[in-house]
Amino acid sequence: MAVLSDAQREAGWTIVKLGDIAPLTYGKSLVASKRIPGDIPVYSSAGLIDSHNEAIIDGQNIIIGRKGTIGSITWSEGPAYPIDTTFYTAGTDKTNIKYLYYLLKTYKFSAMNTDSAVPGLNRVTFESQEAVLPPLDEQERIARILGSLDDKIEANTRLIQTMEDYVHTMIKKISKSDSVKRLAIKDLAVHEKNQELPREHVDGVIHHYSLPAYDSGKTPGLEEADSIKSNKFIIDKPCVLFSKLNPGTPRIWLVNPEEGVNSYASTEFIVLTPKENVDIANLWATCSEERISQNLADMASGTSTSHQRVRPTDILNSKILDLSNQSEICSITSYIEALRKENLQLAETRDALIKRLIG
């Protein structure tokens, strides 16, 4: 139950229902076979999953996971297509939409699951939740503070992408040389398989390397261990995560887990650690070569291009460039990792401020 302090009451804060400030609308079905590639992002409860040529919402909206990853909160800045595993809301004239976005992040909607078979968030349950709401000018002040941190994260993410694109250009150039040999991934890396259910071993927040986290800036999600319902790979040393899902849209992630923090990866990845005398930066770079993903896409099985999976053995047998003499890539990736570490620290600061400023 929401409670106001005397200071909040005097400052004009009120207690409202979420339905009063965040009325929900159902997303619309759009199966993969009906999607026409375009510039409109398609969102599911897992976040950004695809593109389409038509939108059903415009402007600033908040997308909330309804089925699957329930309670996930995703920001949408412009035209978009939230599918039927989501709700969405544009708020009301009582709220600053960005403040509402941060407010919704304080709720544990996963605890409101109404379906034991398929996790689900009921609209009535959501809209009946109480919220402490400050006056609009205070909402705007809080949103500016938190938004400044997200703006810095976004700027770092753009710089990271630029540097990664440069590395990929280098790889393309190197691949044209007849003097560079190729080796199977299994000859350069160890396939790590240790996994566990986080909530059975951790009490508190974990770093979760998931596909949505990759798609949202390649920064691990900060999630409560008890919200994770399935086994995850243990990440306790630097590694490369190679996604098995949709190889035509490659997700190759160089990961340096933060010391002292429990870190896990989705089982949609395979976990690769470099063998002796193999530099992890070079392993990541050469795994990211475009022809590797193209070859794997040709071998993938699935009902559509958005639901294809490749076998771990096919990944491990893929022939990648031997970059043992490439030092420039290592220096670039060191800077990339520094930016990623800064993003993680900024996200942790933001989340701490959300708890302090909002509750």
Residue ranges and their predicted role:
Residues 16-59, 75-77, 81-88, 186-240, ...:
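Sequence-specific dsDNA recognition surfaces
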Residues 66, 139, 307-308, 326:
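Glutamine-centric residue-chemistry signal
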Residues 1-44, 128-198, 324-359:
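Non-catalytic DNA-recognition/assembly elements of restriction-modification systems
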Residues 281, 285, 294, 327-330, ...:
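Feature representing long, continuous alpha-helical segments
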Residues 44-109, 114-117, 122-126, 232-233, ...:
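A short beta-sheet element
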Residues 90, 132, 321:
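Short hydrophobic/aromatic beta-strand micro-patches
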